[in-house]
Every structure is written in C-alpha cells, then in structure tokens.
Amino acid sequence: MSATPGALDGLRVADFSRVLAGPIATMILGDLGADVVKVERPGSGDDTRAWGPPWSPEGVSSYYLGVNRNKRSIALDLKDPADAETARALSLRADVVIENFRPGVMARAGLDHETLRAHRADLVSCRIAGLGRGDLPGYDFLAQAMGGLMSITGDAGGEPHKVGVALVDVMAGLHAAIGILAALRHRDATGEGQLVEVDLLSTTLFSLANQASNWLTAGVVPGRMGNRHPSIAPYETLRASDGPFVIAVGNDEQFRAMCGVLDLPELAGDARFATNSARVTNREALLDALAPTLRDASAAVWVTRLGAAGIPCGMVNQVDQAFALAREVGLEAVATVIGDDGVAVDTVANPLHLSRTPTTYRLAPPGIGEHTEAIRAELTP
C-alpha cells in the first residue's frame, strides 16, 4: 500500500451499482484514491456474491472479489423509509452517485439526479442503463447479441458466439469512469454538476469500431470470420506442428520479412500477395502456400524466429500463462489486498500507471454491510 495520495483522494462516491459495469467504474475510482461506499441489500448484497463456483478458500464468490476492492459496504433497504433517508444523506454528502437500476428505482427512493440536484447543484450522478433509455434489461449477454457483437464473433458459417468475458459491461464501466471524470472537471471549473448516462447498447455499437465503420461508410454488413481480420492478411491464427499461434502482419514490409524467415521468397514476389489488399483478396491461396512450411516447426519456434525479425506474433496463452508472461516482462499484474481479518485476496492490478499519483490497493472487497455502523456514524450530524 502506498502512502502517496491518489489523484482522486478526498472524492466521495455513493455506489448503488451492482454486478459488473458499475462496480468496475467505482473500483477504478477507488484505485485512484476515491472513498467509495458500496450500498448493498441487507442479507444478500450484490448479486455477484451468489455467482459461483468458483469460490475463494473462504467461500466468497471469485466474481465478486474481482471488482470490489477499495470499497466500504453499507447495508440499506431502499424500500425502508429510514434506510432510504440514510441513503439520501449518503448521496448528498457525496461528490458522485452511481447506479444501474431499472428506470424508476432511484426516483422512488428519492435518489434520482433531479431530486438530489435540488439540494446539491454540484452533484455528479451516473446512470448505467441497459439497451437504451427504455426498460429493457441490462445484461451483457443480451447487449452482445442485440448489439451485433455476437454476429461477428465465431467461425465463418458457424454459430454466433459471445466473447469469453462480459466485455460490454467492462467497457461500459470504463466509459462511465471517463464520463464521471469529465463531469468532475466541468464541476471544478463551473461549480455545476450533471448527469452522466451510459447504456450497454451504445457501448456495444461503439466497440464495433472498424466493423461499424464498414457498415456506416461502405454499406458492408460484417460477418463471422473466426480469428481472421476482414481488412488485413495474414492477421489471424496460423497452425504450427504442435498447435496454433497468432500473427499480425500489418504492412507489406512485415510481409516480406515474414517470407524471409519462412524461406519463401517467391511469395514476396508474387503479385497475388504483393500488397495487403491483394493478400486479403487471395487469403486462401496465401494460407495454403504457408501451411506446409509452418508444419515443419512448433509454435514456440515460429514465434521466436518471427519475433526476432520484428514480425508481430505470439502464443495463444491460457489465463495462467498470460499472468506468467506478465511477470516475465516485468509487469505487476496482480494486486494483493489484505482484509481486516488478515485474509489476502489476489486481484488483477489496475493497468493505469501514474508517475505522481499511482493507483493504490487499500481495502479488500468488503463483506455485506461490513462498514455500516462506521458510515452511519459519519453521517450523524
């Protein structure tokens, strides 16, 4: 734990969010030094506390532990008038209020932005919605399906697949954190708060990037291509003697260098492969020409040889291998936090590295209502 104040030291966040998108956003704020108070339902708490297996050795959901460090927890029933009043006091003391309930839940408790801003004009509120501003449910899986992401994920001619992690939720959380920081910058300049809104459908469409642009600018509806890139070749999974590796040849110079490593100079001089656009057009012929040579050595050998020549390539790692690689290249990818009970929890380190105000890991993911009494005491006049 660093004694250096974080960039958001002194910032107070009332966090009514649960599951992933909101908790990712508030964990980022907490890593940067904010005091985040997580509001949970008495008894059951955040939905993800019940999501398992796997569980930690202490029986806590690994899912929950992954996105809830650097937070304190207060247990409040928003349908109970006294608890709702406590929630309002907490919110009016905060700089930021964040939630991802269905529309109307916060308003019924008197916690919506319009109600709160009548008492705190400088308050920043953030709402993470589902598929737009309506009442559609906000689940990542639905967003991936309905937002087009699954239509471009999977093998050509095969079934559509979701990404292997709730990526839309993660990205929505990142956008929420960015929006909150932008709103705070405006507040610091003008004294005026505002409402920040992020929804899963817009987040999914934004994440489509070049695939969305293919439709918007060229009228091309993208489809599934497995691990291939629609506009670059070879930029895909190749098969060596013992399994796959990936290569990302981004320009013609790299392609010529690749041909040199593979001892296939004739491919570099072949008009079908001389330019990237030609290689995309003649992808199947190119892959057929590469296949016999690639079968002569292992994936690790090819990655070593190609990498030494400056050609972007890599192994297809499992998660444990990915963390091992991070250690090998000098990254501190694991952040260990110690709870008041002395239990150590390993979490994924924040990828932000700030030279003057580094991220810190001060608090382990809390138990349900672990800090209720202390927080109530802070709210007492």
Model regions and ranges:
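Oxidoreductase and adenylate-handling cofactor-binding alpha/beta cores
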Residues: 173-193, 207-218, 259-266
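Flexible glycine/proline-enriched surface loops and loop-helix/loop-strand junctions
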Residues: 159-167, 239-243, 357-360
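Aromatic-enriched alpha-helical interface/lid elements that frame and gate functional surfaces
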Residues: 228, 233-309, 313
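N-terminal helix-loop segment corresponding to the beta1-alpha1 unit
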Residues: 1-179, 183-189, 338, 367, ...
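Conserved Rossmann-fold dehydrogenase catalytic segment
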Residues: 133, 157-165, 188-204, 223-230, ...
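Glycine-rich beta-alpha junction loops
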Residues: 43, 130-132, 200-205, 242-244, ...
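Conserved PLP cofactor-binding pocket of PLP-dependent enzymes
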Residues: 307-328
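Terminal low-complexity tails and localization/encapsulation signals of metabolic enzymes
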Residues: 1-12, 223, 239, 321-381
